[in-house]
Amino acid sequence: MQIIDVVAAIIVREGRLLLAQRSPAGDQPGLWEFPGGKVDPGESQPAALARELHEELAIRARIGAYVASHTREVSGRVIHLHAWRVDDYDGEPQALCHSAFVWCEPREAFGYALAPADIPLLEAFMSVRDATPAGSC
C-alpha cells in the first residue's frame, strides 16, 4: 500500500480560518479543506507547506506551530496528514487550485462539507486553542 505524507495549513486571520473548496475535477470534489499538499522526498514538512501555499494560494507563508497529525486510508493509499498553524504570510490568498475560499470562525467550519481527514485536525486545533494553561484557574 502506498504511503503519502501530506501537509495542511490552518491559516488564521483575525480569529478566522481559511477553508478552501476542492476543485470539481480533483479527488474529493467540492469538499472543503485546509490548503496544502504532498511532501516531496527530502523535504521537511514546513518547507513543503510553504511551497504548496505559494503554488496553490500565491502567498509567502511563515509556518508556525505544529498542530496535529491524522492517518487515513483513501483509495488504497495511506495518507499521513500533518497540520501546521500559519498566522503570518505575505500576499492575499488566491484560488489558483481551488473552486472557492471562505474565512470562518473555527466552530462555523463544522457547517461546511469538510474533507474527512481535516475534521480531526480542526478538532485538535480547537482543543489546543481553547485549552487553559495550567495554574491559570
Q: Which residues does each PLM region occupy?
A:
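A conserved beta-turn-beta hairpin within the catalytic core of GNAT-like acetyltransferases
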Residues: 26-31
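C-terminal structural segments of small proteins and small subunits
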Residues: 91, 103-120
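Conserved beta-strand segments that form the floor/walls of ligand-binding pockets within enzyme
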Residues: 18, 33, 85, 102, ...
